[in-house]
Amino acid sequence: MKPIKKLEGKTVAIVGMGKSWFDYNLAKSHGVHFDEVWAINAVADVIFHDRIFMLDPASRFLDSDDAGGQTKSMAKICKTHKGPIYTCELDKRCPGLIEYPIDEIVSEFRCYYLNNTVAYAIAFALWCKVGTLKLFGIDFTYKGNLHFAESGRACVEFWLCKAMERGMTVEVANSSYLLDTAIPGDERLYGYHRLDDPKVILADKNNNYRVFNKSQVQTSQKQQEVVLMDRYDSHLKKNKVGEPNKW
């Protein structure tokens, strides 16, 4: 297999099954653009998508109940989906399966730290030179299996680091704790978070990061007058608020 040329420089959303996948629905409903959407496992049964990443063999879903609640959804997907579904082996019962390019990925990045399906999807995006990666539902907050949560998150963040070092823009759902995204800005820098005037990081319009004291940061948003909704939206014209552009 060769990298997919049409993905070079494009914006791709990877959607997993964590709680922050609801942020994907919010993003879509407010016009956020994705050139492609990649579904992780059973998310493919819920949202529109262009590709599925399912690194478990199809037999796990077709011949056992080992996948728990995902089993029925994934069995249906495996039997009926036309693909592409990237996985570890082909199965005659499943028309859409494509073998993941594991040889090419390991050779390209000289790395085989791949302990979960999301990491494989990120590595694939990096291999295809995707320009922007937006992650939703990639949370690794499994209370019943903390070891899996910690090891999976570590692997995903490792690959995100590799992607960012190669120039890829990475964005994480606001409600996800991946890359400490949901942590308040003045609590992200360990040690400095204990100071009376903690350090915060802000990005300029060129996406260059700068360090400020919290006291230096001034909000550019003016306080808006509180308004009540009416059926003619006359208050929006009066206060020049209009429909929000950012959420």
Predicted regions and their residues:
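Metal-ion/cofactor- or nucleotide/acyl-coenzyme-handling active-site neighborhoods
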Residues: 1-247
